[in-house]
Swiss-Prot record:
Keyword annotations of the record: Aminoacyl-tRNA synthetase, ATP-binding, Cytoplasm, Ligase, Magnesium, Metal-binding, Nucleotide-binding, Protein biosynthesis
Reactions catalysed according to its record: tRNA(Phe) + L-phenylalanine + ATP = L-phenylalanyl-tRNA(Phe) + AMP + diphosphate + H(+)
Pfam families named among the record's database cross-references: Phe_tRNA-synt_N (PF02912), tRNA-synt_2d (PF01409)
Cofactor remark from the record: Binds 2 magnesium ions per tetramer.
Main location: cytoplasm
A single GO molecular function term of this UniProt record: catalytic activity, acting on a protein
Enzyme kind, highest EC tier: ligase
Organism: Limosilactobacillus reuteri (strain DSM 20016) (Lactobacillus reuteri)
Record's subunit section: Tetramer of two alpha and two beta subunits.
Protein name: Phenylalanine--tRNA ligase alpha subunit
InterPro entries linked to this entry: aa-tRNA-synth_II, aa-tRNA-synth_II/BPL/LPL, Phe-tRNA-synth_IIc_asu, Phe-tRNA_ligase_II_N, Phe_tRNA_ligase_alpha1_bac, Phenylalanyl-tRNA_Synthase, tRNA-bd_arm
Gene Ontology CC entries for this record: cytoplasm
E.C. no: 6.1.1.20
Family of the protein in this entry: Belongs to the class-II aminoacyl-tRNA synthetase family. Phe-tRNA synthetase alpha subunit type 1 subfamily.
Amino acid sequence: MGLREKLAELREEGLQDIKQSEDLKRINEIRVKMLGKKGPITSVLRGMRDLSAEERPKVGQFANKVRDELSAAIEEKRAELEQAAMNAKLAAQTIDVTLPGTPVAQGQPHVIQQIIDQVVDLFVSMGYEVAVGDEVEQEVYNFEKLNLPKDHPARDMQDTFYVTPSVLMRTQTSPMQARMLEKHDFSQGPLKMISPGKVYRRDTDDATHSHQFHQIEGMVVGKNITMADLKGTLEAVAQNLFGDKLKVRLRPSYFPFTEPSVEADITCFNCLGKGCAICKQTGWIEVLGAGMVHPNVLKMSGVDPEEYGGFAFGLGPDRFAMLKYGVDDIRNFYQNDVRFLNQFDQKG
């Protein structure tokens, strides 16, 4: 019997064995037996050295064809057996599709983020631009351009986290005032912006202080903008967060970046001005600082204070959340106690 006939016989034998295989173990045995280095096809091929130069390539091509056919048949049978095994496994498992599924807990925005979103949505509805700045800021934007000179106490190492002598973790979101003033085209109208974000100060953490907290800076600069515009804006914020009946009063204060500067108080939302423990019987609650943008701040950002003016304010979402929900310790917001945080579930 010639080599070609032997190969044909091995092919038929192999295909028959593959067809009759009933499990994966048997199909693997056939693969090793027929196609392995010690298998019959390899043994037949060793006899090719005795063939003539004319016959050798023909037999070689036929041998490769036989090997390919057997390999394809083995893989096809393997896939068939694997699918059959999977079907048998699934058939053996009883699944009651009427049983309720396992509930998956849904996340939600943190209570402070809820306050931020509420304030941002309000200002966006009033045409403000949201400007989000970097938490690592250049000292010049955090201080000089906001009219805080070199000898100002807020610039001491004991109050500020410095990264390098000229780079720091921003102590306020106010640097975005200067950055937005520098690039705004006033020929297109006034600048109306808010800048929410995290800020950092070297405070000792206690019930009312944290080394990291949140701030929302707001500013409007244009022509003919007055303190009355500021008061109306702050009343819109207070009423949006605490109720329509609240009023705002302004008291003189001092901030380096505004002149004149004011502290803004709102009617106590608990007693509506009658006096209670929350407002210490005054009927008012201090909520934020504000004022008219200092001419020096405008000048240092290339804006002519003789032509343009405006107001600025900075509110603390952390403090607003404490007031709104009666939380007496700011640390509760950051300790990740789910029992505490779930009280502010927006889904109810």
